[in-house]
Design a protein with these regions (language model features):
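Core segments of cupin and vicinal oxygen chelate
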Residues: 17-61
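Acidic di-acidic motifs
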Residues: 22, 92, 124
Length: 139
């Protein structure tokens, strides 16, 4: 492998996003069901959309809940034929699975053991897949 020299151009992932149909419903799901913290909620553009970001507590990364307005954006909402749109980490998938189900979160099966840890696939308010993972220390 070639050694890297100089300054790294990419140093962080501060922001990611997910397209949603209804920003209010998405904000409710991500804060009240998943327990993420609302960082921003401000008017954005002339369409009535809002700039909404949420984040796990004490994390630098923010998740934009972007209103799907264009046709290609709308086509991405609720798609479950590809990889999850987000992966969220937890220290205990089984406990999180139980607590989130009690809050009404839909899962596509029970937690499953992988070579790297345990994971479970859940669906957000629009049916977009989100992977909940717990990494193992046994690598």
């Amino acid at each position: 492998m070639k050694e890297r020299k100089g300054i790294e151009m990419i140093k962080d992932v501060p922001l990611t996003g997910i397209f949603v149909n209804d920003q209010g419903a998405a904000l409710d799901f991500y804060t009240n069901k998943l327990g993420l913290k609302k960082i921003q909620d401000e008017p954005y553009g002339e369409s009535g959309a809002r700039w909404i970001t949420v984040s796990p507590a004490e994390m630098k990364i923010r998740i934009v809940l972007k209103k799907a307005e264009k046709e290609h954006e709308k086509a991405m909402v609720g798609r479950s034929d590809g990889p999850p749109v987000l992966t969220l980490g937890t220290d205990d998938v089984r406990s999180a699975y139980k607590a989130l189900r009690e809050r009404g979160v839909r899962f596509l099966g029970e937690p499953y053991r992988y070579p790297w840890g345990i994971g479970a696939l859940l669906l957000d308010q629009d049916g977009s897949p989100i992977f909940l993972q717990q990494e193992s220390n046994e690598r």
